[in-house]
């Protein structure tokens, strides 16, 4: 016996009567937040320091033809970066508190901060930063038609069962990724569990930004922390 698939509600011979939209309570939970703020006042000084760090790498490393990007050493311990790192640390702590986390006995600490300088065709695949709480970017040199920052849906079950989108150019509940166009002087922060990527740089000019990650340490750990040379900076 041949089985027949019945399409419910697809009988075009019947006149379709539209019913009024039901008014339902709508609750939103488990959201993924992206935070941005314009801070052009940091551009001049941070840009100068960033170039110094990248130039050190250029002296010892040639630009890779397959992955044409320079990545600097850690920058957060440079005392000239203190005003910037203090501000970023304040934002990171404020974000976590506003999200409902209890940081009474905890402090925010930098684990990484480095410059990325992407040349033509360089980009980054989707990834995230484990063992951290807040990740972010400060955009420095942004050429015309710059790469996009892509934020990906972190829910594998939702991505697995996702239906086709009506309009992929619009940000809706059906979207699996959202893109942002960087601007010089923009700070962007997200939770570190939120995956991100960058589209390839189509320009002859490099696309440059500072990337940073912050984790959490206990206040007791802060009090017993080693002196100079420690790999975490409390902010």
Please identify what each model-predicted range represents.
Residues 2-102, 227-233:
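Non-heme Fe(II)/2-oxoglutarate
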Residues 31-33, 111, 132-134, 206-208:
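Residues at beta-strand starts and edge strands
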Residues 38-39, 117-119, 153, 192:
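Pocket-edge structural micro-motifs
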Residues 38-40, 139-141, 213-217:
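Solvent-exposed residues in well-ordered beta-strands and their adjoining turns
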Residues 56-60, 73-85, 130-135, 150-160, ...:
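Short N-terminal helix-initiation segments at or just after the protein's N-terminus
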Residues 86-146:
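Conserved double-stranded beta-helix
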Residues 170-235:
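Catalytic core of Fe(II)/2-oxoglutarate
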């Amino acid at each position: 016996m041949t089985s027949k698939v019945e399409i419910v509600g697809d009988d075009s011979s019947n006149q379709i009567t539209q019913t009024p939209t039901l008014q339902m309570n709508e609750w939103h939970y488990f959201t993924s937040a992206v935070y941005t703020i314009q801070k052009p006042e940091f551009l001049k000084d941070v840009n100068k320091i960033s170039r110094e760090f990248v130039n050190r790498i250029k002296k010892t490393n040639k630009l890779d033809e397959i992955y044409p990007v320079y990545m600097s050493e850690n920058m957060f311990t440079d005392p000239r970066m203190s005003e910037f790192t203090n501000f970023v640390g304040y934002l990171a702590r404020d974000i976590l508190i506003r999200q409902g986390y209890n940081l009474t006995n905890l402090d925010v600490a930098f684990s990484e901060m480095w410059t990325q300088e992407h040349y033509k065709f360089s980009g980054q695949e989707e990834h995230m930063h484990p063992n951290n709480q807040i990740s972010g970017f400060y955009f420095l040199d942004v050429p015309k038609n710059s790469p996009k920052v892509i934020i990906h849906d972190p829910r594998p079950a939702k991505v697995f069962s996702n239906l086709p989108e009506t309009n992929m150019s619009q940000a809706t509940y059906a979207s699996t990724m959202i893109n942002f166009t960087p601007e010089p002087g923009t700070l962007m922060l997200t939770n570190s569990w939120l995956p991100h990527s960058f589209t390839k740089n189509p320009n002859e000019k490099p696309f440059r930004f500072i990337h940073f990650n912050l984790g959490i340490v206990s206040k007791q750990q802060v009090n017993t922390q080693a002196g100079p040379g420690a790999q975490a900076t409390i902010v």
